[in-house]
């Protein structure tokens, strides 16, 4: 019997964070990522990571094969048929790796999410990511990554559990477009770091819902204040519905610096 060309067994050796790292490396380096020396460095870095405690080490060959498969998928012409089922699903549940945080959201009725405002930056130690829900296109803190799958199109999806919600509200989300490092609440002493044109995560309060949505800064009315209280006003336009609103510092979070 001919050997299967399904390469999913190579992908299942990696954790989600390792795949995200390799996605970014491939985006920067392209086919240069196939070089043996580079793959050895990546494999050594992954194997020495604390996230690999209790897991087998990664070999440079596994890393190289991952990049080869990525390059192959990128080179293939787009098919006109519907995408095939996912290549694999891998269990990432690990209580020691992903710490749950106190509830920052509640579920109301059958379909309405209601979020509370984020805390201080010092509260972010255990929650590193946020994900965008397909239900309302709002961003929620991620409590844990449960499984992931690599589609035949090469896209990576992960199943997330949102902080403050149970497994009934778990979702598959696209890693590239709907998962990112958690936004950071802006302290009064940091308001000068927010500029016109910046992308912010904004707390949008409406009569029927309260959501965290992306918005761009259109204008800033800066006031004189001390490090303990900020009276600046930020005019933002929400990406969700293209409406504009003036917000105080307590209703905005900045994106981490790259």
From Swiss-Prot:
It is found in: Nucleus. Changing residue 165 to A: Loss of interaction with H3K9 and strong DNA methylation defects. Its main location: nucleus. The keyword Hydrolase does not apply. It comes from the Eukaryota. Residues 138-244 are annotated as: SAWADEE domain. Keywords: Metal-binding, Nucleus, Zinc. Disruption phenotype: Loss of DRM2 controlled DNA methylation, but no effect on CMT3 or MET1 controlled methylation. One of its GO terms (biological process) is DNA methylation-dependent constitutive heterochromatin formation. Changing residue 130 to A: DNA methylation defects. GO terms for molecular function: chromatin binding; metal ion binding. Zn(2+) binds at residues 191, 225, 230, 232. One of its GO terms (cellular component) is nucleus. Coiled coil: none annotated. Associates in vivo with Pol IV but not with Pol V and this interaction is not dependent on its H3K9me binding activity. Glu-130 and Asp-141 interact with the H3K4 side chain while the H3K9me1/2/3 side chains insert into a hydrophobic aromatic cage formed by Tyr-140, Phe-162 and Phe-165. Involved in RNA-directed DNA methylation (RdDM). Required for the silencing of some endogenous RdDM targets and accumulation of 24-nt siRNAs, but not for the production of Pol V-dependent transcripts. Functions in transcriptional silencing through both DNA methylation-dependent and -independent pathways. Required for both maintenance and de-novo DNA methylation. Plays a role in the recruitment of Pol IV to genomic regions associated with K9 methylated histone H3 that are targets for RdDM. Associates with the RNA polymerase IV (Pol IV) complex. Interacts with NRPD1, NRPD2, NRPD3, NRPD3B, CLSY1 and CLSY2. The SAWADEE domain (138-244) binds to mono-, di-, or trimethylated H3K9 histone peptides, but this interaction is impaired if H3K4me2/3 methylation is present. PANTHER family: PROTEIN SAWADEE HOMEODOMAIN HOMOLOG 1, PROTEIN SAWADEE HOMEODOMAIN HOMOLOG 2. This is Protein SAWADEE HOMEODOMAIN HOMOLOG 1. It comes from Arabidopsis thaliana. The gene is SHH1.
